[in-house]
Amino acid sequence: MSGGLRSGIGGLIPHHVGNETLVKLWDTASKRAGKADPAERRANRAAFRNHVDRIRESRGLIEDQPCYGDMRYGSVSMAYAGCEIIAVFNALSFLTGKMPRLDRLIEAFGKDGVSFKGRFGTAPLAAVRFLRRLGFSAEPVFLREDMEALAASCRALILVYYNDGDDIGAMVHTIFISKENGRLTAHNAGMGGMAGPRARDLAELIGKLAGGNAREIMLIGIEKRS
């Protein structure tokens, strides 16, 4: 995308639409009812089985979204638009120690969250609703200072960010972040199937995402309710 477009049309949303406003608009444009096609459900279930061994090798976490072109989400593939669902999958796996069924998550977000038939992925607030229905505490925040405070106190996080804070045309990505021994690790962040990058705090981690061009939109802190 040209520099002129980056600073003009491409920069309009990142520079002039607030994070919380953007997320709420995204949610309004997303689906909250629907019935999954039985044949698609069966195909996704069969396809997921082919990924299970590789997920187990990655500590129960999905790090390789581009490999999921065999699973459908709306009118597109999980390789194209599955990052929000994969972030939820990784959060559940990390917090419970049990691998969830990705095909069932696809079905759930197809009923509440899928945006423009999957072409815009999943509305992040649908992830908040889903996690709360499962009994987790899920707190969304939109300002950098609130995000840094949340990241300091929470061991499981979902981050939504612009791949380029000056260009909406570079799209948005969503990742799970784990915290162990005081260090943050990003998952499914485009590291060639590996976990990472890693950092001491959220600001440092964001600075390492998307070639240093990332800009935060929303952070969800997830905890088990006592």
Positions of predicted regions on the chain:
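Active-site-adjacent structural segments surrounding the nucleophilic cysteine of cysteine proteases
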Residues: 1-116
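Noncatalytic regulatory segments and standalone regulatory/sensor domains
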Residues: 11-15, 21-27, 178-226
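Non-catalytic, solvent-exposed segments at the cell envelope interface
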Residues: 72-78, 127, 131, 206-210
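Stable alpha-helical elements in mature extracytoplasmic
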Residues: 84-87, 123-127, 143, 147
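A structural signal for well-ordered alpha-helical scaffolds and beta->alpha junctions
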Residues: 85, 120-124, 199, 213
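Mid-length scaffold segments of soluble, non-membrane domains
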Residues: 114-140
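Active-site-adjacent substructure of cysteine-protease-like catalytic cores
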Residues: 139-186
